[in-house]
Each structure stands twice: as C-alpha cells, then as structure tokens.
Amino acid sequence: MNSRQQTILQMVIDQGQVSVTDLAKATGVSEVTIRQDLNTLEKLSYLRRAHGFAVSLDSDDVETRMMSNYTLKRELAEFAASLVQPGETIFIENGSSNALLARTLGEQKKNVTIITVSSYIAHLLKDAPCEVILLGGVYQKKSESMVGPLTRQCIQQVHFSKAFIGIDGWQPETGFTGRDMMRTDVVNAVLEKECEAIVLTDSSKFGAVHSYSIGPVERFNRVITDSKIRASDLMHLEHSKLTIHVVDI
C-alpha cells in the first residue's frame, strides 16, 4: 500500500463514506487513479466501493482498524516492544495496536513466547521466530478472536509475566470499558492472573465510555498512549497510581 492509498483509507475510516471526487481533490490525482486505488484497496478488503463512493468496512475488522492512525499505533507498538525482554512469555490481547505490537516483536526477531486469543495475530506471526500459543474458544469471525468459557479455562492453564490489553473507552467515573461483552469477559480473566497488566491504546479512547467494565483500574500497572491525550485525562490516570508512558507523536 502506497502513501496515497494510506491517505485514502484514513479518510474513508474517519468519515465512513467519501466520494471519488473528494478523494481526487484531497490527493491531487485524477478520478481514474482514485478508482484504480479503490479497486486495489477493495481487493485487499480494506474498504468497499459503492457508486461514486468509497465506504468503510465494519469497525470490528482488525486489518482495517490497524490501518487507522497507522503511524501513531506503530510508534506505540515499538515502545511497548521495548518493554519485552528476550525469553519472556507474554499475553497479547486482540486489537489493532496489539496486532502491531505482535508484528513488531516478530520483525525484531525477539526470542519470546506470545500467548494470544487472536487468530489474526497468530497468522501474522506464522513466519516469525517467536513461539505462538493460540488459545481456544468460540471464534468471533469479525474480530478474529476467541471468546467464551473455554477461553477462560485456557487462560487459567497458562502463565505469562506481562499482558498487553486494548480498551475501547475510559472515563474517571467508569475506569476502562469495552464495547463487546465476550471480549471484556476474556480480558477480566487475564486480569485475574499474576502478571503485569499493560493498557496499550491511542489517546482517542480516553473520554469514551462503553457498556462493559474492564478492571478494576487498580489491577493495571501501566498505560501506554500518545501525546495527544488530554491533560485532564492524564492527571486522573496518574492519580490512579498507574505508570503512564506517553509516546510523543
């Protein structure tokens, strides 16, 4: 994917639907070129075409979400990877930032064992030198993730020193929250383990709130996010006695 196609995809993700005319104006190329780019992106399952428009895919699609704010998430992933030591066994939960963390660890050829509930992450690491343990459960097709009672049982049987977890929202009154009940249940099972729990998320999630609680906040050790986080949110997080890593973007 070239830089123009990344720009197109970002616009479509941000707006949900963008006309071919607007994409041509924004990128400075002809509508013919835009249609060629859209054909390419549709074949890669990043978006879908409608008459005269490009339309975003379902927000549960991991690959599409990973391309949203890609550069920012890549910076977060590289910082998170620096916390992982050679020979360590870690848990990486589902989600776009976590998928980039897994990819980064694979590219760095670190001798680590990665336990995950994400079949997407497992496939991403198929050629990487690290060992991958994919836990079983009920398969959520859109998120490409395992959930349910069997997944909870699997989590009880494995051990890891760090867990990297994604969130969908955070507010001072609610703490960390998720929008999927089954996924949230899996995360809470992870938090019952004796491990260092690390939130890996871009700053857009702060200020949002969803139906299902992840936590309590006191169970987490660190938060890795970007420098666009609001000062008030940062202050509240620090008052929760979390170690906050703010990556400059």
From Swiss-Prot:
One of its GO terms (cellular component) is cytosol. GO terms for biological process: DNA damage response; regulation of DNA-templated transcription. It holds the Pfam family HTH_DeoR. Residues 1-56 form the HTH deoR-type domain. SUPFAM superfamilies: NagB/RpiA/CoA transferase-like (SSF100950), Winged helix' DNA-binding domain (SSF46785). It comes from the Bacteria. One of its GO terms (molecular function) is ligand-modulated transcription factor activity. Disulfide bonds: none annotated. InterPro entries: Carb_Metab_HTH_regulators (IPR050313), DeoR-like_C (IPR014036), DeoR_HTH (IPR001034), NagB/RpiA_transferase-like (IPR037171), Tscrpt_reg_HTH_DeoR_CS (IPR018356), WH-like_DNA-bd_sf (IPR036388), WH_DNA-bd_sf (IPR036390). This is Uncharacterized HTH-type transcriptional regulator YciT. It comes from Escherichia coli (strain K12). The gene is yciT.
